[in-house]
């Protein structure tokens, strides 16, 4: 929905992301839904680290190789992605006043993150599962830069 896909197709994609991926302050890397075809995550020895039919991993914690790495792209919520979702939302609805208001509200869901962890900064990732604990780097530059970039887009006409 950032210009490559427009109209109703873009609106359907944004709505699906809204339903399954968006959490307060971030966007999950994978929805907590069954997948087809199966998506197996294995150890170097070939052992399964997940359920291939339901690969969602909602918590980014534990051992680096057997817990955090598999979770990173299978359910962990990325803070830097939420501003792009907000931009896609307003572009899918041609910057209607309602879409700008909604996008600002989503972007403001990042505000509590500024008051936790490394104060005044945005983290790298959150758990995909509630209560969406902050994880990874406490002060992630591209989380902040994306939030600022999109905030400017949403407020350029004021």
Task: Name these PLM-found stretches.
Residues 1-158:
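Acidic, mature catalytic/reactive cores of soluble proteins
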């Amino acid at each position: 929905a950032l210009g490559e896909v427009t109209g109703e197709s873009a609106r359907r994609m944004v709505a699906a992301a809204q339903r399954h991926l968006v959490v307060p302050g971030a966007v999950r890397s994978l929805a907590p839904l069954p997948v087809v075809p199966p998506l197996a995550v294995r150890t170097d020895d070939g052992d399964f680290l997940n359920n291939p039919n339901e690969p969602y991993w909602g918590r980014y914690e534990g051992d680096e190789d057997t817990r955090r790495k598999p979770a990173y792209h299978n359910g962990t919520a990325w803070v830097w992605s939420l501003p792009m979702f907000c931009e896609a939302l307003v572009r899918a609805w041609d910057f209607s006043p309602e879409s700008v208001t909604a996008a600002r509200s989503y972007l403001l869901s990042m505000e509590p993150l500024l008051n936790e962890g490394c104060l005044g900064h945005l983290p790298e990732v959150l758990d995909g599962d509630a209560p969406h604990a902050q994880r990874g780097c406490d002060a992630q530059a591209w989380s902040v830069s994306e939030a600022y970039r999109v905030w400017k887009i949403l407020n350029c006409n004021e």
